[in-house]
Amino acid sequence: NSVGKPSLSDLDGPTQVRGYSTAPRGTGYPSMVVTAQTWNQELAYEYGQSFGNDMKAVGVVGLWGFACDLHIDPFFGRNNESPSEDPFLAGTVMAKAVSGVNTRGRYTFLKHFAVYNAYCERTYMSEQTLRETNLKAFRKAFVDGGSLGAMTSYQSVGAENSNYSEALITGVLRKEWQFKGAVTTDAISGADYQFEGLVRCGGNFGMNVALGAAPTMKDKIKYSESETTGRMQNRMRDAVHQILYTWLHADYNERYYQANGKESGSYISSTSINSWVWWKPFLISLDVVAGCALVYWMICATLNFVKLEKEENA
Protein backbone atom coordinates (compact mmCIF):
# COMPACT_ATOMS: atom_id res chain seq x y z
CA ASN A 1 0.00 0.00 0.00
CA SER A 2 2.85 2.42 0.74
CA VAL A 3 3.90 2.51 -2.94
CA GLY A 4 0.51 1.93 -4.53
CA LYS A 5 1.30 -1.47 -6.01
CA PRO A 6 -1.88 -3.40 -6.85
CA SER A 7 -2.37 -7.08 -6.15
CA LEU A 8 -1.10 -9.01 -9.18
CA SER A 9 -1.63 -12.57 -10.36
CA ASP A 10 1.21 -14.83 -11.55
CA LEU A 11 0.27 -18.29 -12.83
CA ASP A 12 1.71 -21.35 -14.52
CA GLY A 13 1.15 -22.73 -17.99
CA PRO A 14 4.03 -23.50 -20.39
CA THR A 15 1.80 -23.58 -23.49
CA GLN A 16 -1.50 -22.28 -22.11
CA VAL A 17 -2.23 -19.47 -19.65
CA ARG A 18 -3.95 -20.93 -16.58
CA GLY A 19 -3.55 -24.34 -18.18
CA TYR A 20 -3.39 -26.02 -14.77
CA SER A 21 -6.15 -23.90 -13.24
CA THR A 22 -9.89 -23.54 -13.54
CA ALA A 23 -11.43 -21.61 -16.44
CA PRO A 24 -11.15 -19.11 -17.98
CA ARG A 25 -8.02 -20.31 -19.72
CA GLY A 26 -5.95 -18.98 -22.56
CA THR A 27 -5.39 -20.58 -25.95
CA GLY A 28 -3.75 -24.00 -25.93
CA TYR A 29 -0.68 -23.61 -28.15
CA PRO A 30 1.58 -26.29 -29.64
CA SER A 31 4.60 -27.20 -27.56
CA MET A 32 7.66 -24.99 -27.72
CA VAL A 33 9.44 -27.80 -29.57
CA VAL A 34 7.11 -27.26 -32.54
CA THR A 35 7.82 -23.53 -32.51
CA ALA A 36 11.57 -24.20 -32.51
CA GLN A 37 11.21 -26.62 -35.43
CA THR A 38 9.94 -23.81 -37.64
CA TRP A 39 13.28 -21.97 -37.37
CA ASN A 40 11.18 -18.82 -37.66
CA GLN A 41 12.16 -15.99 -35.32
CA GLU A 42 9.28 -13.76 -36.39
CA LEU A 43 6.80 -16.54 -35.65
CA ALA A 44 8.31 -17.02 -32.17
CA TYR A 45 7.95 -13.28 -31.58
CA GLU A 46 4.30 -13.33 -32.67
CA TYR A 47 3.79 -16.43 -30.48
CA GLY A 48 4.90 -14.37 -27.51
CA GLN A 49 2.63 -11.48 -28.43
CA SER A 50 -0.37 -13.79 -28.74
CA PHE A 51 0.53 -15.40 -25.41
CA GLY A 52 0.70 -11.93 -23.87
CA ASN A 53 -2.76 -11.13 -25.24
CA ASP A 54 -4.12 -14.24 -23.52
CA MET A 55 -2.48 -13.21 -20.27
CA LYS A 56 -4.20 -9.84 -20.43
CA ALA A 57 -7.54 -11.44 -21.30
CA VAL A 58 -7.57 -13.72 -18.24
CA GLY A 59 -6.01 -11.22 -15.84
CA VAL A 60 -2.55 -12.77 -15.48
CA VAL A 61 0.42 -10.41 -15.19
CA GLY A 62 3.33 -12.81 -14.69
CA LEU A 63 3.88 -16.22 -16.28
CA TRP A 64 5.78 -19.01 -14.56
CA GLY A 65 7.48 -19.79 -17.85
CA PHE A 66 8.71 -20.08 -20.53
CA ALA A 67 11.06 -23.04 -20.05
CA CYS A 68 14.57 -22.74 -21.45
CA ASP A 69 15.92 -26.11 -20.29
CA LEU A 70 17.95 -28.18 -22.74
CA HIS A 71 16.93 -31.66 -23.89
CA ILE A 72 19.90 -33.45 -22.33
CA ASP A 73 17.94 -36.55 -21.29
CA PRO A 74 15.46 -37.85 -23.90
CA PHE A 75 13.47 -39.54 -21.11
CA PHE A 76 12.90 -36.33 -19.16
CA GLY A 77 9.15 -35.79 -18.82
CA ARG A 78 9.21 -32.02 -19.33
CA ASN A 79 11.19 -31.73 -22.56
CA ASN A 80 8.02 -30.62 -24.34
CA GLU A 81 8.07 -27.32 -22.41
CA SER A 82 11.43 -26.16 -23.77
CA PRO A 83 12.53 -25.66 -27.38
CA SER A 84 15.58 -27.77 -28.11
CA GLU A 85 18.75 -29.58 -27.09
CA ASP A 86 20.76 -26.90 -28.91
CA PRO A 87 21.55 -23.86 -26.74
CA PHE A 88 21.70 -21.39 -29.63
CA LEU A 89 18.34 -22.46 -31.05
CA ALA A 90 16.71 -22.62 -27.62
CA GLY A 91 18.03 -19.21 -26.62
CA THR A 92 17.05 -17.57 -29.90
CA VAL A 93 13.48 -18.89 -29.79
CA MET A 94 13.09 -17.95 -26.12
CA ALA A 95 14.48 -14.45 -26.69
CA LYS A 96 11.91 -13.75 -29.39
CA ALA A 97 9.01 -15.28 -27.45
CA VAL A 98 9.90 -13.29 -24.32
CA SER A 99 10.21 -10.09 -26.36
CA GLY A 100 6.73 -10.69 -27.73
CA VAL A 101 5.23 -11.10 -24.26
CA ASN A 102 7.01 -7.93 -23.13
CA THR A 103 5.17 -5.84 -25.73
CA ARG A 104 1.90 -6.66 -23.96
CA GLY A 105 3.00 -5.32 -20.59
CA ARG A 106 3.43 -8.79 -19.12
CA TYR A 107 6.51 -10.55 -17.79
CA THR A 108 7.89 -14.08 -17.76
CA PHE A 109 9.73 -16.05 -15.09
CA LEU A 110 12.11 -17.91 -17.37
CA LYS A 111 12.71 -21.39 -15.98
CA HIS A 112 14.37 -23.47 -14.67
CA PHE A 113 17.57 -21.61 -13.88
CA ALA A 114 19.61 -23.74 -14.38
CA VAL A 115 20.46 -27.31 -15.44
CA TYR A 116 17.03 -28.85 -14.95
CA ASN A 117 16.81 -31.81 -17.28
CA ALA A 118 16.27 -34.88 -15.06
CA TYR A 119 14.13 -35.78 -12.05
CA CYS A 120 16.91 -37.66 -10.28
CA GLU A 121 20.63 -38.33 -10.70
CA ARG A 122 21.04 -34.81 -12.04
CA THR A 123 23.60 -33.67 -14.59
CA TYR A 124 27.29 -33.42 -13.68
CA MET A 125 29.36 -30.92 -15.66
CA SER A 126 32.23 -28.47 -15.42
CA GLU A 127 31.73 -24.70 -15.30
CA GLN A 128 32.96 -24.39 -18.89
CA THR A 129 30.39 -26.94 -20.06
CA LEU A 130 27.69 -25.17 -18.06
CA ARG A 131 28.48 -21.83 -19.71
CA GLU A 132 28.68 -23.33 -23.20
CA THR A 133 25.34 -25.17 -22.92
CA ASN A 134 22.62 -24.33 -20.39
CA LEU A 135 23.76 -20.83 -19.49
CA LYS A 136 24.27 -19.94 -23.15
CA ALA A 137 20.59 -20.53 -23.85
CA PHE A 138 19.46 -18.59 -20.78
CA ARG A 139 21.81 -15.71 -21.54
CA LYS A 140 20.24 -15.09 -24.94
CA ALA A 141 16.77 -15.11 -23.42
CA PHE A 142 17.70 -12.74 -20.59
CA VAL A 143 20.08 -10.38 -22.37
CA ASP A 144 18.65 -10.37 -25.91
CA GLY A 145 15.04 -11.12 -25.01
CA GLY A 146 14.85 -8.98 -21.89
CA SER A 147 13.08 -11.42 -19.59
CA LEU A 148 12.07 -9.62 -16.39
CA GLY A 149 11.80 -12.71 -14.21
CA ALA A 150 13.62 -15.95 -13.46
CA MET A 151 12.59 -19.17 -11.75
CA THR A 152 15.19 -21.30 -10.03
CA SER A 153 15.35 -25.09 -10.02
CA TYR A 154 15.85 -27.82 -7.44
CA GLN A 155 19.29 -29.31 -7.68
CA SER A 156 22.75 -28.52 -6.43
CA VAL A 157 25.29 -26.26 -8.06
CA GLY A 158 28.46 -27.60 -6.57
CA ALA A 159 27.66 -28.13 -2.91
CA GLU A 160 24.86 -25.53 -2.82
CA ASN A 161 21.22 -25.72 -3.79
CA SER A 162 20.69 -23.64 -6.94
CA ASN A 163 17.90 -21.69 -5.22
CA TYR A 164 20.44 -20.03 -2.96
CA SER A 165 23.56 -20.25 -5.09
CA GLU A 166 25.17 -16.83 -4.86
CA ALA A 167 27.51 -17.70 -7.72
CA LEU A 168 24.59 -18.49 -10.02
CA ILE A 169 21.94 -15.94 -9.02
CA THR A 170 24.08 -12.98 -8.00
CA GLY A 171 27.33 -13.71 -9.83
CA VAL A 172 26.07 -14.81 -13.23
CA LEU A 173 22.48 -13.57 -13.47
CA ARG A 174 22.63 -10.21 -11.72
CA LYS A 175 26.26 -9.12 -12.13
CA GLU A 176 27.42 -10.66 -15.42
CA TRP A 177 24.10 -10.32 -17.27
CA GLN A 178 22.94 -7.15 -15.47
CA PHE A 179 19.57 -8.70 -14.64
CA LYS A 180 17.42 -6.32 -12.57
CA GLY A 181 14.17 -8.28 -12.30
CA ALA A 182 12.69 -10.72 -9.79
CA VAL A 183 13.72 -14.30 -9.01
CA THR A 184 11.22 -16.85 -7.67
CA THR A 185 11.54 -20.47 -6.65
CA ASP A 186 9.90 -23.40 -8.34
CA ALA A 187 6.94 -25.00 -6.53
CA ILE A 188 7.82 -25.51 -2.86
CA SER A 189 6.90 -28.93 -1.54
CA GLY A 190 8.64 -29.12 1.82
CA ALA A 191 8.94 -27.27 5.11
CA ASP A 192 12.75 -27.31 5.18
CA TYR A 193 13.23 -24.77 2.42
CA GLN A 194 15.87 -22.12 3.18
CA PHE A 195 13.94 -19.04 2.14
CA GLU A 196 16.39 -16.73 3.89
CA GLY A 197 19.23 -18.22 1.85
CA LEU A 198 17.33 -17.44 -1.35
CA VAL A 199 16.86 -13.78 -0.40
CA ARG A 200 20.45 -13.35 0.78
CA CYS A 201 21.82 -14.76 -2.48
CA GLY A 202 19.78 -12.60 -4.84
CA GLY A 203 16.30 -14.17 -4.91
CA ASN A 204 13.04 -12.39 -4.20
CA PHE A 205 10.18 -14.71 -3.24
CA GLY A 206 8.96 -18.29 -3.16
CA MET A 207 6.15 -19.66 -5.26
CA ASN A 208 3.05 -19.70 -3.06
CA VAL A 209 2.44 -23.45 -2.98
CA ALA A 210 3.56 -24.44 0.50
CA LEU A 211 5.47 -21.35 1.62
CA GLY A 212 4.44 -20.60 5.18
CA ALA A 213 1.86 -23.39 5.23
CA ALA A 214 3.70 -25.68 7.64
CA PRO A 215 4.33 -24.62 11.25
CA THR A 216 8.00 -25.55 10.99
CA MET A 217 8.39 -23.33 7.95
CA LYS A 218 6.68 -20.42 9.71
CA ASP A 219 9.15 -20.79 12.55
CA LYS A 220 12.12 -20.64 10.20
CA ILE A 221 11.05 -17.57 8.18
CA LYS A 222 11.42 -14.36 10.16
CA TYR A 223 9.21 -11.48 9.11
CA SER A 224 9.63 -9.41 12.27
CA GLU A 225 12.08 -6.50 11.98
CA SER A 226 13.23 -7.01 15.56
CA GLU A 227 14.18 -10.63 14.85
CA THR A 228 15.95 -9.99 11.54
CA THR A 229 19.56 -8.87 11.07
CA GLY A 230 20.44 -5.53 9.51
CA ARG A 231 22.00 -7.25 6.52
CA MET A 232 18.81 -9.20 5.91
CA GLN A 233 16.71 -6.03 6.19
CA ASN A 234 18.86 -4.31 3.56
CA ARG A 235 18.62 -7.33 1.29
CA MET A 236 14.83 -7.39 1.75
CA ARG A 237 14.70 -3.75 0.61
CA ASP A 238 16.65 -4.71 -2.51
CA ALA A 239 14.32 -7.66 -3.08
CA VAL A 240 11.23 -5.43 -2.87
CA HIS A 241 12.88 -2.91 -5.21
CA GLN A 242 13.51 -5.66 -7.78
CA ILE A 243 9.91 -6.86 -7.54
CA LEU A 244 8.63 -3.33 -8.11
CA TYR A 245 11.06 -2.89 -11.01
CA THR A 246 9.67 -6.02 -12.67
CA TRP A 247 6.09 -4.75 -12.44
CA LEU A 248 6.85 -1.17 -13.52
CA HIS A 249 9.23 -2.09 -16.33
CA ALA A 250 6.65 -4.45 -17.80
CA ASP A 251 4.23 -1.53 -18.01
CA TYR A 252 6.98 0.64 -19.51
CA ASN A 253 7.67 -2.01 -22.17
CA GLU A 254 4.05 -1.94 -23.32
CA ARG A 255 3.86 1.85 -23.38
CA TYR A 256 7.11 2.05 -25.35
CA TYR A 257 5.87 -0.49 -27.87
CA GLN A 258 2.57 1.34 -28.34
CA ALA A 259 4.38 4.63 -28.84
CA ASN A 260 6.94 3.32 -31.31
CA GLY A 261 4.87 0.81 -33.24
CA LYS A 262 5.60 -2.58 -34.69
CA GLU A 263 9.05 -1.63 -35.97
CA SER A 264 10.35 -1.41 -32.40
CA GLY A 265 9.99 -5.14 -31.85
CA SER A 266 13.66 -5.61 -31.07
CA TYR A 267 13.93 -2.84 -28.50
CA ILE A 268 12.89 -4.86 -25.47
CA SER A 269 16.20 -6.20 -24.31
CA SER A 270 19.09 -5.49 -22.05
CA THR A 271 22.30 -3.98 -23.38
CA SER A 272 24.37 -6.72 -24.95
CA ILE A 273 27.97 -5.95 -25.91
CA ASN A 274 29.59 -8.65 -28.00
CA SER A 275 33.13 -9.38 -26.91
CA TRP A 276 35.88 -8.61 -29.45
CA VAL A 277 37.54 -11.63 -31.01
CA TRP A 278 40.56 -11.50 -33.31
CA TRP A 279 39.36 -14.02 -35.85
CA LYS A 280 36.33 -12.06 -37.06
CA PRO A 281 38.26 -9.09 -38.55
CA PHE A 282 40.94 -11.52 -39.73
CA LEU A 283 38.43 -13.59 -41.70
CA ILE A 284 36.78 -10.47 -43.11
CA SER A 285 40.18 -9.14 -44.23
CA LEU A 286 41.03 -12.54 -45.70
CA ASP A 287 37.76 -12.55 -47.66
CA VAL A 288 38.46 -9.06 -49.00
CA VAL A 289 42.01 -9.96 -50.06
CA ALA A 290 40.84 -13.20 -51.68
CA GLY A 291 38.05 -11.35 -53.49
CA CYS A 292 40.43 -8.70 -54.82
CA ALA A 293 42.88 -11.38 -55.94
CA LEU A 294 40.11 -13.24 -57.75
CA VAL A 295 38.96 -10.09 -59.55
CA TYR A 296 42.58 -9.29 -60.53
CA TRP A 297 43.07 -12.82 -61.86
CA MET A 298 39.86 -12.63 -63.91
CA ILE A 299 40.92 -9.30 -65.43
CA CYS A 300 44.38 -10.63 -66.31
CA ALA A 301 42.92 -13.83 -67.76
CA THR A 302 40.43 -11.85 -69.85
CA LEU A 303 43.11 -9.49 -71.19
CA ASN A 304 45.40 -12.40 -71.98
CA PHE A 305 42.58 -14.20 -73.80
CA VAL A 306 41.80 -11.08 -75.87
CA LYS A 307 45.49 -10.66 -76.70
CA LEU A 308 45.82 -14.25 -77.89
CA GLU A 309 42.69 -13.90 -80.04
CA LYS A 310 44.12 -10.80 -81.73
CA GLU A 311 47.46 -12.53 -82.40
CA GLU A 312 45.73 -15.53 -83.96
CA ASN A 313 43.58 -13.32 -86.20
CA ALA A 314 46.51 -11.12 -87.27
Regions of interest found by a model, annotated:
Residues 1-314:
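Glycoside hydrolase catalytic-domain context in secreted enzymes
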